[in-house]
């Protein structure tokens, strides 16, 4: 998937506007393409005077609010913005997903005060493929959280500049494919982590998704993208 039209990836200053804090807003239309909508969550402490990590969420059935809810508590705890597409699909043509990304990406940069080096992407199933593709093709994504995903051609994965947290149910039909990504990242000496959970092909439980965010926080410390928090590191290693 290579149909990204927004390749000028410099972060723009946030446009002044009313954002609802501490609650999931189910539908926000993009100013770039009003046919594209997404759900969002910003922490209670959000202020445009500082920059915040942002997580792009891609559900394979366009369930933006539902998918955002899975990350809401972790986003509040760690101070992340969540933006979750209402348009991404799986098992279909590329064009709807390309339109969703091309409408979301610049709009999110305009509306929210985001940290340009702390942009993350996650997805489930086909949404995980989309998240990985976005990271591969833009070099603008710091980390990918892949849930029950696969890769179209694992052998072609190369020069991975982002951190990867993979997870899948132990009876998920994409379980082995997710582990193949893990094996390839090991070969490339990339930064990775994999955790399974009991279950079939579905989004991971909230507590596991929270750990994925926590792990990304630790990786950000290693990369000098945020101050070191020794207490957080200790909790993450427990």
Report residues per predicted region:
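Short beta-strand/loop motif that positions the catalytic acidic residue
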Residues: 165-168
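Short beta-strand element of the alpha/beta-hydrolase
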Residues: 50-61
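Acidic catalytic loop of the alpha/beta-hydrolase fold
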Residues: 170-176, 202
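Short amphipathic alpha-helix adjacent to the substrate-entry channel of hydrolases
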Residues: 66-83
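Primarily recognizes the serine-hydrolase "nucleophile elbow" in alpha/beta-hydrolase
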Residues: 67, 109-111, 117-162
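C-terminal catalytic histidine-bearing segment of alpha/beta-hydrolase fold enzymes
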Residues: 179-182, 186-238
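A domain-start/cap signature at the N-terminus of enzymes
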Residues: 14-52, 126, 133
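Gly/Ser-rich "nucleophile elbow"/oxyanion-hole loop immediately N-terminal to the catalytic nucleophile
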Residues: 44-51, 93-125
